[in-house]
Amino acid sequence: MFNLFEASLSRRSLIAAGAALGLAALAPAVLGNVNLTRRALADEAAKTVTITCLNGAKEAIELEVPFDPQRIAILDLASLDILDSLGVGDRVVGMASTSIDYLSTYSENTDLVPLGTIKEADLEAVMECEPDVIFIGGRLSSMYDDLSQIAPVVFLQTDTAADGKGVIESVRDNATTIASMFGLEDEIAGKMEAFDQRIAALQEFAAGKTAVVGMCTSGSFNVLGNDGRCSIIGREVGFDNVAAGAAAEQNGQDHNQGGSGEHGGKPEGTGKQGEGEGQDEGKSGSGEAVAAVTATHGNEASFETIVSLDPDYVFVMDRDAAIGTEGAQLAREIMDNELVQSMRAAQDNHIVYLEHPNVWYTAEGGITALDYMLADLEQGLGLSE
Protein backbone atom coordinates (compact mmCIF):
# COMPACT_ATOMS: atom_id res chain seq x y z
CA MET A 1 0.00 0.00 0.00
CA PHE A 2 1.36 3.43 -0.97
CA ASN A 3 2.70 5.38 2.04
CA LEU A 4 2.30 9.14 1.49
CA PHE A 5 4.67 10.03 4.31
CA GLU A 6 7.43 7.80 3.01
CA ALA A 7 6.98 9.16 -0.50
CA SER A 8 7.19 12.73 0.77
CA LEU A 9 10.30 11.93 2.75
CA SER A 10 11.84 10.29 -0.25
CA ARG A 11 11.18 13.36 -2.40
CA ARG A 12 12.71 15.66 0.25
CA SER A 13 15.76 13.43 0.42
CA LEU A 14 16.18 13.54 -3.32
CA ILE A 15 15.83 17.32 -3.35
CA ALA A 16 18.36 17.70 -0.54
CA ALA A 17 20.75 15.37 -2.24
CA GLY A 18 20.35 17.26 -5.49
CA ALA A 19 20.97 20.56 -3.76
CA ALA A 20 24.08 19.19 -2.11
CA LEU A 21 25.36 17.93 -5.43
CA GLY A 22 24.60 21.31 -7.00
CA LEU A 23 26.51 23.18 -4.30
CA ALA A 24 29.38 20.78 -4.65
CA ALA A 25 29.44 21.44 -8.36
CA LEU A 26 29.27 25.21 -7.85
CA ALA A 27 31.97 25.34 -5.18
CA PRO A 28 34.97 25.14 -7.56
CA ALA A 29 33.46 27.83 -9.76
CA VAL A 30 32.86 30.12 -6.79
CA LEU A 31 36.34 29.51 -5.41
CA GLY A 32 37.74 29.97 -8.88
CA ASN A 33 36.07 33.34 -9.20
CA VAL A 34 37.48 34.38 -5.82
CA ASN A 35 40.97 33.36 -6.91
CA LEU A 36 40.57 35.19 -10.21
CA THR A 37 39.54 38.31 -8.33
CA ARG A 38 42.55 38.04 -6.05
CA ARG A 39 44.87 37.56 -9.03
CA ALA A 40 43.30 40.52 -10.80
CA LEU A 41 43.90 42.70 -7.75
CA ALA A 42 47.49 41.47 -7.52
CA ASP A 43 48.02 42.12 -11.23
CA GLU A 44 46.60 45.60 -10.84
CA ALA A 45 48.99 46.32 -7.96
CA ALA A 46 51.88 45.03 -10.08
CA LYS A 47 51.05 47.56 -12.80
CA THR A 48 52.52 50.38 -10.69
CA VAL A 49 55.76 50.78 -8.80
CA THR A 50 56.90 53.43 -6.32
CA ILE A 51 60.23 55.12 -7.01
CA THR A 52 62.21 57.92 -5.38
CA CYS A 53 62.84 60.97 -7.56
CA LEU A 54 62.53 64.77 -7.32
CA ASN A 55 59.67 67.21 -7.60
CA GLY A 56 59.75 70.68 -9.16
CA ALA A 57 61.31 72.12 -6.01
CA LYS A 58 64.09 69.50 -6.26
CA GLU A 59 62.89 67.75 -3.12
CA ALA A 60 63.09 63.96 -2.88
CA ILE A 61 59.63 62.38 -3.17
CA GLU A 62 58.04 58.95 -3.48
CA LEU A 63 56.25 58.73 -6.83
CA GLU A 64 53.91 56.00 -8.06
CA VAL A 65 54.54 55.33 -11.74
CA PRO A 66 53.30 52.71 -14.22
CA PHE A 67 55.20 49.43 -14.17
CA ASP A 68 56.56 48.51 -17.59
CA PRO A 69 55.28 51.71 -19.25
CA GLN A 70 54.57 51.40 -22.96
CA ARG A 71 54.52 55.08 -23.96
CA ILE A 72 57.43 57.23 -22.78
CA ALA A 73 58.07 60.94 -23.34
CA ILE A 74 61.74 61.96 -23.12
CA LEU A 75 62.90 65.43 -22.10
CA ASP A 76 66.19 64.30 -20.53
CA LEU A 77 69.02 62.77 -22.53
CA ALA A 78 70.62 60.90 -19.63
CA SER A 79 67.32 59.11 -19.02
CA LEU A 80 66.99 58.26 -22.72
CA ASP A 81 70.55 56.93 -22.61
CA ILE A 82 69.65 54.63 -19.71
CA LEU A 83 66.39 53.44 -21.32
CA ASP A 84 68.31 52.70 -24.52
CA SER A 85 70.94 50.73 -22.59
CA LEU A 86 68.18 48.68 -20.97
CA GLY A 87 66.71 47.80 -24.36
CA VAL A 88 63.37 49.55 -23.82
CA GLY A 89 63.94 52.51 -26.11
CA ASP A 90 61.20 51.25 -28.40
CA ARG A 91 58.70 52.56 -25.82
CA VAL A 92 59.71 56.17 -26.59
CA VAL A 93 56.91 58.02 -28.39
CA GLY A 94 58.31 61.56 -28.21
CA MET A 95 61.61 63.23 -27.33
CA ALA A 96 63.58 66.45 -27.08
CA SER A 97 66.04 67.29 -29.84
CA THR A 98 69.64 66.09 -29.61
CA SER A 99 72.77 65.94 -31.77
CA ILE A 100 74.43 63.11 -29.85
CA ASP A 101 75.53 60.45 -32.34
CA TYR A 102 74.69 57.36 -30.32
CA LEU A 103 71.12 58.63 -29.84
CA SER A 104 70.62 59.36 -33.54
CA THR A 105 68.32 56.33 -33.87
CA TYR A 106 65.81 58.35 -31.90
CA SER A 107 66.52 61.86 -33.18
CA GLU A 108 66.21 60.64 -36.80
CA ASN A 109 63.03 58.62 -36.18
CA THR A 110 60.23 60.58 -37.86
CA ASP A 111 57.62 58.52 -36.00
CA LEU A 112 58.60 60.16 -32.72
CA VAL A 113 56.84 63.37 -31.74
CA PRO A 114 59.27 66.33 -31.38
CA LEU A 115 58.82 67.63 -27.82
CA GLY A 116 60.99 70.75 -27.92
CA THR A 117 64.36 70.89 -26.20
CA ILE A 118 65.87 69.87 -22.88
CA LYS A 119 65.49 73.53 -21.88
CA GLU A 120 61.93 74.18 -23.06
CA ALA A 121 59.23 71.56 -23.56
CA ASP A 122 56.35 71.86 -26.02
CA LEU A 123 53.41 71.04 -23.72
CA GLU A 124 50.95 70.55 -26.57
CA ALA A 125 53.31 68.08 -28.23
CA VAL A 126 53.77 66.20 -24.96
CA MET A 127 49.99 65.90 -24.58
CA GLU A 128 49.70 64.79 -28.20
CA CYS A 129 51.93 61.74 -27.68
CA GLU A 130 49.79 60.58 -24.71
CA PRO A 131 52.67 59.28 -22.56
CA ASP A 132 52.37 56.88 -19.63
CA VAL A 133 55.36 58.61 -18.03
CA ILE A 134 57.58 61.65 -18.71
CA PHE A 135 61.32 61.93 -17.97
CA ILE A 136 62.85 65.37 -17.37
CA GLY A 137 66.19 66.86 -16.35
CA GLY A 138 67.27 69.88 -14.35
CA ARG A 139 66.53 72.62 -16.84
CA LEU A 140 62.85 71.66 -16.94
CA SER A 141 62.22 71.59 -13.20
CA SER A 142 60.21 74.81 -13.55
CA MET A 143 57.78 72.96 -15.85
CA TYR A 144 57.38 70.00 -13.49
CA ASP A 145 53.88 70.92 -12.29
CA ASP A 146 52.56 71.58 -15.80
CA LEU A 147 53.98 68.32 -17.11
CA SER A 148 52.59 66.43 -14.11
CA GLN A 149 49.10 67.32 -15.32
CA ILE A 150 49.77 65.13 -18.35
CA ALA A 151 51.48 62.07 -16.81
CA PRO A 152 53.75 61.12 -13.89
CA VAL A 153 57.04 63.02 -14.18
CA VAL A 154 60.29 61.25 -13.32
CA PHE A 155 62.91 63.90 -12.47
CA LEU A 156 66.35 62.45 -11.71
CA GLN A 157 69.60 64.35 -11.29
CA THR A 158 73.30 63.81 -11.65
CA ASP A 159 74.37 65.01 -8.22
CA THR A 160 77.75 66.65 -8.76
CA ALA A 161 77.44 69.19 -5.96
CA ALA A 162 80.52 69.64 -3.79
CA ASP A 163 79.03 67.43 -1.07
CA GLY A 164 76.93 65.27 -3.42
CA LYS A 165 77.23 61.63 -4.44
CA GLY A 166 79.12 62.32 -7.69
CA VAL A 167 78.70 61.07 -11.24
CA ILE A 168 79.33 57.35 -10.76
CA GLU A 169 76.94 56.86 -7.85
CA SER A 170 74.35 59.08 -9.55
CA VAL A 171 74.46 56.88 -12.64
CA ARG A 172 74.22 53.76 -10.48
CA ASP A 173 71.24 55.05 -8.48
CA ASN A 174 69.37 56.64 -11.38
CA ALA A 175 69.84 53.66 -13.66
CA THR A 176 68.62 51.32 -10.92
CA THR A 177 65.58 53.53 -10.35
CA ILE A 178 64.68 53.52 -14.04
CA ALA A 179 65.37 49.79 -14.33
CA SER A 180 62.98 49.11 -11.43
CA MET A 181 60.15 50.47 -13.58
CA PHE A 182 60.69 47.51 -15.92
CA GLY A 183 61.91 44.81 -13.53
CA LEU A 184 65.43 45.04 -15.01
CA GLU A 185 67.45 45.98 -11.92
CA ASP A 186 69.81 43.00 -12.26
CA GLU A 187 71.14 44.34 -15.56
CA ILE A 188 72.49 47.48 -13.92
CA ALA A 189 74.79 45.67 -11.48
CA GLY A 190 76.81 44.07 -14.29
CA LYS A 191 77.12 47.31 -16.23
CA MET A 192 78.30 49.25 -13.17
CA GLU A 193 80.81 46.58 -12.16
CA ALA A 194 82.64 47.12 -15.45
CA PHE A 195 82.67 50.88 -14.84
CA ASP A 196 84.02 50.40 -11.32
CA GLN A 197 86.97 48.44 -12.70
CA ARG A 198 87.76 51.16 -15.23
CA ILE A 199 87.53 53.87 -12.58
CA ALA A 200 89.93 51.90 -10.37
CA ALA A 201 92.49 51.79 -13.20
CA LEU A 202 92.13 55.54 -13.79
CA GLN A 203 92.50 56.21 -10.07
CA GLU A 204 95.72 54.23 -9.98
CA PHE A 205 97.08 56.32 -12.85
CA ALA A 206 95.94 59.66 -11.37
CA ALA A 207 97.35 59.10 -7.89
CA GLY A 208 99.77 61.90 -7.00
CA LYS A 209 99.23 63.83 -10.25
CA THR A 210 97.98 67.41 -10.56
CA ALA A 211 95.62 68.80 -13.17
CA VAL A 212 93.74 71.86 -14.35
CA VAL A 213 90.25 71.10 -15.63
CA GLY A 214 88.63 73.67 -17.87
CA MET A 215 86.09 74.56 -20.51
CA CYS A 216 86.74 76.58 -23.65
CA THR A 217 83.84 78.86 -24.51
CA SER A 218 83.50 82.10 -26.48
CA GLY A 219 87.23 82.29 -27.08
CA SER A 220 88.28 81.97 -23.43
CA PHE A 221 89.39 79.23 -21.05
CA ASN A 222 87.30 78.81 -17.89
CA VAL A 223 88.55 76.74 -14.98
CA LEU A 224 86.23 74.18 -13.38
CA GLY A 225 86.17 72.97 -9.79
CA ASN A 226 85.51 69.55 -8.30
CA ASP A 227 81.77 69.94 -8.71
CA GLY A 228 79.53 70.47 -11.72
CA ARG A 229 80.75 69.58 -15.19
CA CYS A 230 83.83 67.37 -15.55
CA SER A 231 83.93 66.88 -11.76
CA ILE A 232 84.53 63.17 -12.31
CA ILE A 233 88.16 64.03 -13.17
CA GLY A 234 88.98 65.56 -9.79
CA ARG A 235 86.57 63.58 -7.61
CA GLU A 236 86.10 60.01 -8.78
CA VAL A 237 89.25 59.65 -10.89
CA GLY A 238 91.30 61.53 -8.32
CA PHE A 239 93.52 64.06 -10.08
CA ASP A 240 94.50 66.90 -7.76
CA ASN A 241 92.60 69.77 -9.39
CA VAL A 242 94.93 72.66 -8.53
CA ALA A 243 92.52 75.24 -10.00
CA ALA A 244 89.56 74.19 -7.85
CA GLY A 245 90.34 76.61 -5.03
CA ALA A 246 90.74 79.58 -7.36
CA ALA A 247 87.48 78.69 -9.10
CA ALA A 248 85.59 78.58 -5.82
CA GLU A 249 87.13 81.84 -4.58
CA GLN A 250 86.16 83.79 -7.70
CA ASN A 251 82.75 82.16 -7.81
CA GLY A 252 82.05 83.31 -4.28
CA GLN A 253 82.54 86.90 -5.43
CA ASP A 254 80.21 86.32 -8.40
CA HIS A 255 77.52 84.83 -6.20
CA ASN A 256 77.23 87.89 -4.02
CA GLN A 257 76.32 89.79 -7.18
CA GLY A 258 73.28 87.60 -7.65
CA GLY A 259 74.48 84.96 -10.12
CA SER A 260 72.83 81.58 -10.35
CA GLY A 261 72.98 78.44 -12.44
CA GLU A 262 71.65 74.95 -12.90
CA HIS A 263 74.16 72.13 -13.27
CA GLY A 264 75.03 69.45 -10.80
CA GLY A 265 73.09 70.72 -7.84
CA LYS A 266 71.49 68.95 -4.93
CA PRO A 267 67.85 68.50 -3.98
CA GLU A 268 65.87 71.12 -2.09
CA GLY A 269 66.76 74.08 -4.23
CA THR A 270 70.54 74.01 -4.09
CA GLY A 271 70.99 73.35 -7.79
CA LYS A 272 70.06 71.23 -10.77
CA GLN A 273 71.34 68.33 -12.72
CA GLY A 274 72.38 66.57 -15.83
CA GLU A 275 72.25 68.74 -18.89
CA GLY A 276 71.70 71.86 -16.78
CA GLU A 277 74.05 74.54 -15.61
CA GLY A 278 76.33 75.07 -12.63
CA GLN A 279 75.28 76.81 -9.46
CA ASP A 280 77.07 79.63 -7.70
CA GLU A 281 78.88 79.58 -4.41
CA GLY A 282 79.40 82.01 -1.58
CA LYS A 283 76.56 82.99 0.74
CA SER A 284 72.86 82.38 0.82
CA GLY A 285 70.33 85.19 0.92
CA SER A 286 70.45 85.09 4.72
CA GLY A 287 74.21 85.61 4.68
CA GLU A 288 75.03 82.04 5.73
CA ALA A 289 77.96 80.32 4.04
CA VAL A 290 77.11 77.60 1.52
CA ALA A 291 79.20 74.89 -0.11
CA ALA A 292 81.67 75.97 -2.78
CA VAL A 293 80.35 75.21 -6.24
CA THR A 294 81.37 75.96 -9.80
CA ALA A 295 79.48 78.56 -11.82
CA THR A 296 77.49 77.79 -14.95
CA HIS A 297 80.43 77.72 -17.35
CA GLY A 298 83.28 77.77 -14.86
CA ASN A 299 85.33 80.87 -14.13
CA GLU A 300 87.42 82.60 -16.76
CA ALA A 301 91.14 82.36 -16.09
CA SER A 302 94.09 83.99 -17.79
CA PHE A 303 96.62 81.76 -19.45
CA GLU A 304 99.22 83.28 -17.12
CA THR A 305 97.25 81.81 -14.22
CA ILE A 306 97.17 78.38 -15.81
CA VAL A 307 100.90 78.52 -16.49
CA SER A 308 101.60 79.54 -12.89
CA LEU A 309 99.68 76.51 -11.59
CA ASP A 310 102.06 74.26 -13.58
CA PRO A 311 99.83 71.14 -13.59
CA ASP A 312 100.91 67.71 -14.77
CA TYR A 313 97.82 67.54 -17.00
CA VAL A 314 95.29 69.94 -18.51
CA PHE A 315 91.82 68.63 -19.40
CA VAL A 316 89.83 70.67 -21.91
CA MET A 317 86.13 70.47 -22.78
CA ASP A 318 84.98 72.44 -25.84
CA ARG A 319 81.57 73.94 -25.01
CA ASP A 320 81.07 75.60 -28.39
CA ALA A 321 81.66 72.28 -30.15
CA ALA A 322 79.26 70.63 -27.70
CA ILE A 323 76.37 72.92 -28.57
CA GLY A 324 77.30 73.47 -32.23
CA THR A 325 78.04 77.19 -32.08
CA GLU A 326 78.54 78.32 -35.67
CA GLY A 327 81.80 80.12 -36.41
CA ALA A 328 83.14 79.57 -32.89
CA GLN A 329 86.85 79.25 -32.26
CA LEU A 330 87.62 75.63 -31.41
CA ALA A 331 89.29 74.64 -28.16
CA ARG A 332 92.49 73.51 -29.88
CA GLU A 333 92.77 76.91 -31.55
CA ILE A 334 92.21 78.74 -28.26
CA MET A 335 94.85 76.67 -26.51
CA ASP A 336 97.36 77.03 -29.34
CA ASN A 337 99.33 79.99 -27.99
CA GLU A 338 102.85 80.60 -26.72
CA LEU A 339 101.91 80.67 -23.04
CA VAL A 340 100.15 77.31 -23.15
CA GLN A 341 102.85 75.76 -25.32
CA SER A 342 105.46 76.83 -22.77
CA MET A 343 103.79 74.72 -20.08
CA ARG A 344 105.32 71.48 -18.91
CA ALA A 345 101.99 69.74 -19.61
CA ALA A 346 102.07 70.85 -23.25
CA GLN A 347 105.68 69.83 -23.72
CA ASP A 348 104.90 66.40 -22.24
CA ASN A 349 101.85 66.06 -24.52
CA HIS A 350 99.60 66.07 -21.46
CA ILE A 351 96.87 68.39 -22.69
CA VAL A 352 93.80 66.15 -22.97
CA TYR A 353 90.93 67.29 -25.19
CA LEU A 354 87.71 65.49 -24.28
CA GLU A 355 86.70 64.02 -27.64
CA HIS A 356 82.95 63.89 -27.04
CA PRO A 357 82.13 67.31 -25.54
CA ASN A 358 78.41 67.10 -26.36
CA VAL A 359 78.19 63.96 -24.23
CA TRP A 360 80.00 65.60 -21.32
CA TYR A 361 77.88 68.74 -21.68
CA THR A 362 74.37 67.40 -22.35
CA ALA A 363 74.16 63.70 -21.47
CA GLU A 364 76.28 63.29 -18.33
CA GLY A 365 74.48 60.78 -16.14
CA GLY A 366 73.71 58.17 -18.79
CA ILE A 367 75.20 54.69 -19.04
CA THR A 368 76.55 55.04 -22.57
CA ALA A 369 77.57 58.61 -21.76
CA LEU A 370 79.69 57.33 -18.87
CA ASP A 371 81.28 54.80 -21.21
CA TYR A 372 82.20 57.61 -23.64
CA MET A 373 83.51 59.85 -20.84
CA LEU A 374 85.75 57.15 -19.40
CA ALA A 375 86.94 56.27 -22.90
CA ASP A 376 87.86 59.92 -23.52
CA LEU A 377 89.98 59.90 -20.36
CA GLU A 378 91.53 56.50 -21.10
CA GLN A 379 92.44 57.55 -24.64
CA GLY A 380 93.76 60.95 -23.59
CA LEU A 381 95.93 59.41 -20.89
CA GLY A 382 97.22 56.59 -23.09
CA LEU A 383 95.36 53.89 -21.17
CA SER A 384 93.07 52.63 -23.91
CA GLU A 385 93.72 49.14 -25.21
Residue ranges and their predicted role:
Residues 130-136, 310-314:
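Proline-aspartate-enriched helix->loop->beta-strand connector
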Residues 56-59, 115-122, 249, 293-303:
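Short helix-initiation/N-cap motifs at beta->coil->alpha
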Residues 71, 170-173, 180, 305, ...:
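Structured C-terminal subdomain patch of bacterial secreted/periplasmic proteins
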Residues 254-286:
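Ser/Thr/Gly/Pro-rich low-complexity, disordered linker/stalk segments of secreted
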Residues 101, 227-256, 282-297:
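Alpha-helical, coiled-coil/dimerization segments enriched in small aliphatic residues
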Residues 71-125:
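A short, structured surface patch at a secondary-structure boundary
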Residues 2-78, 186-216, 263-267, 272-276, ...:
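Bacterial Sec-exported substrate-binding components of ABC uptake systems
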Residues 143-219, 276-284, 350, 359-385:
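Extracytoplasmic substrate-binding proteins
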